């Protein structure tokens, strides 16, 4: 059995910490919220993110990052994309040996437009980096933590990291496939959040199944276009890290991206919607990154562009729908 430090005490990090503990691994979680840390240690719950779900009693948690760094040789990086670089740099400053980093973030960094594995490569010295991977796919934390059947993909440039990730997490309710296409798996996880926000918007506006089906299909098309341009295998987007994640995020009220979009579709402002949710919504930050990235690499992404204008230029949602439906005639 392995020792694993989970950096982050959000919903998915907590659910995966529970999987690891259930699989017999020693788990230490690190976070900054003292109330959450105390809850995990004393009550074996994380009420902020997973309500009353009972956690494995062997999971421990700490506020002290030095303790967290020293605990294990395997790190699960379960942090928002915008926090990843800073925490990784802090970890690197405390290391004296190589560690394996597995992340579960689904975003693209603002300004640099880098994927999370690239951010980690930037932040972790080669002398401290034993390998970087990602675990991604259709996996709501709320279902994983209560052991409902879930299937995901583990990807890395390193075959040994892919195998390690599969071995760590796979059990009778969490099935893990390996996938060599790190670029595609990361991009699929990040870009589907954009489409999920847009899916929430059209639901909030009262549109039906026809509109949602079209949005998801054309959303997958623009995800694939950008992915191919950036070196991904287009087949990846037909797998768990692509269409699998897209379906679950665009159709479920568990999805914070969908929920945010729904509030926007009802006519609420971005600030109001975010304040009501009081959670990180990766799709907002990813839309900003990908809008600018698509211009830089000259890839047509009309849904991303329309959502960017809603989020950051205050364009009314009904006008953005007209923009999309009124585009010039094209072949599919």
From Swiss-Prot:
Keyword Acetylation part of the UniProt annotation: no
Catalytic machinery residues: 192
Signal peptide location: none
Gene Ontology process terms (BP): carbohydrate metabolic process; glycerol-3-phosphate biosynthetic process; glycerol-3-phosphate catabolic process; glycerophospholipid metabolic process; phospholipid biosynthetic process
Binding residues annotated for NADPH, in chain numbering: 11-12, 32, 106, 141, 256, 280, 282
This enzyme's EC code(s): 1.1.1.94
Entry's Gene Ontology molecular function annotations: glycerol-3-phosphate dehydrogenase [NAD(P)+] activity; NAD binding
Gene Ontology annotations for the cellular component aspect, listed alphabetically: cytosol
Keywords, sorted A to Z: Cytoplasm, Lipid biosynthesis, Lipid metabolism, NAD, NADP, Nucleotide-binding, Oxidoreductase, Phospholipid biosynthesis, Phospholipid metabolism
UniProt-annotated binding residues for sn-glycerol 3-phosphate: 106, 137, 139, 192, 245, 255-257
Pathway as given in its UniProt record: Membrane lipid metabolism; glycerophospholipid metabolism
Keyword Cell inner membrane included in the entry's annotation: no
Main EC class the enzyme belongs to: oxidoreductase
Subcellular location: Cytoplasm
Reaction equations catalysed: sn-glycerol 3-phosphate + NAD(+) = dihydroxyacetone phosphate + NADH + H(+); sn-glycerol 3-phosphate + NADP(+) = dihydroxyacetone phosphate + NADPH + H(+)
Described function: Catalyzes the reduction of the glycolytic intermediate dihydroxyacetone phosphate (DHAP) to sn-glycerol 3-phosphate (G3P), the key precursor for phospholipid synthesis.
Stated family: Belongs to the NAD-dependent glycerol-3-phosphate dehydrogenase family.
Protein name according to UniProt: Glycerol-3-phosphate dehydrogenase [NAD(P)+]
Organism: Staphylococcus saprophyticus subsp. saprophyticus (strain ATCC 15305 / DSM 20229 / NCIMB 8711 / NCTC 7292 / S-41)
């Amino acid at each position: 059995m392995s020792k694993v430090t989970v950096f982050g005490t959000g919903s998915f990090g907590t659910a995966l910490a529970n999987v690891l503990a259930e699989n017999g691994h020693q788990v230490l979680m690190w976070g900054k919220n003292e109330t959450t840390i105390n809850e995990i240690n004393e009550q074996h719950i994380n009420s902020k993110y997973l309500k009353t779900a009972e956690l494995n009693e062997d999971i421990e948690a700490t506020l002290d990052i030095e303790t967290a760094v020293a605990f294990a040789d395997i790190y699960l990086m379960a942090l928002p994309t915008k926090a990843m670089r800073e925490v990784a740099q802090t970890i690197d400053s405390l290391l004296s040996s190589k560690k394996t980093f597995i992340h579960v973030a689904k975003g693209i960094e603002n300004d640099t437009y880098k994927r999370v594995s690239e951010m980690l490569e930037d932040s972790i010295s080669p002398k401290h980096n034993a390998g970087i991977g990602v675990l991604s796919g259709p996996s709501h934390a709320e279902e994983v933590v209560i052991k409902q059947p879930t299937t995901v993909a583990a990807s890395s440039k390193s075959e040994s990291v892919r195998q390690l990730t599969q071995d760590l997490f796979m059990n009778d309710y969490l099935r893990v496939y390996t996938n060599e296409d790190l670029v595609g798996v990361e991009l699929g996880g990040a870009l589907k959040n954009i489409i999920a926000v847009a899916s929430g918007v059209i639901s909030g506006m009262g549109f039906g199944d026809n509109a949602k089906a079209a949005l998801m299909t054309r959303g997958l098309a623009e995800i694939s276009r950008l992915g191919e341009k950036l070196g991904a295998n287009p087949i990846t987007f037909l797998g768990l890290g692509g269409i699998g994640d897209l379906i679950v995020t665009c159709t479920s009220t568990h999805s914070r991206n969908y929920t945010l979009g729904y509030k926007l579709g009802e006519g609420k402002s971005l600030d109001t919607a975010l304040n009501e949710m009081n959670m990180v919504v990766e799709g907002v930050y990813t839309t900003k990154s990908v809008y600018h990235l698509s211009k830089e690499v000259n890839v047509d992404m009309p849904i991303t562009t329309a959502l960017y204008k809603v989020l950051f230029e205050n364009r009314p949602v009904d006008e953005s729908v007209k923009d999309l439906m009124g585009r010039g005639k094209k072949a599919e």
